[in-house]
C-alpha cells in the first residue's frame, strides 16, 4: 500500500466571477498520495462548494508538510491515526 502524505496547497481563487469578481487567497491542507491527486482534490472541493470554475483557481504553491506543521485540526487528527475501522 502507498503511504498517504499531507500537502499544503496555497493559491488564489476568483469568487463570483460573473457579477463582482473578488480574488481571495486560500491555504488548504490535503491528504493525498501524490501532488497530482492533491491538486485534483482542491479543484473538486473549491469548485463543488463555491461554484468556482477550474480556470478561476490558481495554485501558486504545493508542498509536502510534516505533522507538526499542520494548523488544520481535522487533518492533524487524521494523520495521527494508525488505522480506521468502518
Swiss-Prot record:
InterPro entries the record matches: Ribosomal_eL20 (IPR028877), Ribosomal_eL20_dom (IPR023573)
SUPFAM superfamilies to which the protein is assigned, alphabetical: RplX-like
Single GO biological process annotation from the record: translation
Alphabetical list of Gene3D superfamilies matching this protein: 3.10.20.10
Coiled coil: none
Assembly and binders: Part of the 50S ribosomal subunit. Binds 23S rRNA.
Family stated for the protein in its record: Belongs to the eukaryotic ribosomal protein eL20 family.
Entry protein name: Large ribosomal subunit protein eL20
Species of the source: Sulfolobus acidocaldarius (strain ATCC 33909 / DSM 639 / JCM 8929 / NBRC 15157 / NCIMB 11770)
Gene name of the record: rpl18a
Amino acid at each position: 500500500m502507498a503511504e498517504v502524505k499531507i500537502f499544503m496547497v496555497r493559491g488564489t481563487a476568483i469568487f463570483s466571477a460573473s457579477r463582482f469578481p473578488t480574488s481571495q487567497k486560500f491555504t488548504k491542507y490535503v491528504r493525498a498520495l501524490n501532488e497530482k491527486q492533491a491538486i485534483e482534490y482542491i479543484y473538486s472541493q473549491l469548485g463543488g462548494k463555491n461554484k468556482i470554475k477550474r480556470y478561476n483557481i490558481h495554485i501558486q504553491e504545493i508542498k509536502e508538510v510534516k505533522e507538526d506543521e499542520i494548523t488544520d485540526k481535522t487533518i492533524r487528527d487524521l494523520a495521527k491515526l494508525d488505522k480506521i475501522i468502518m
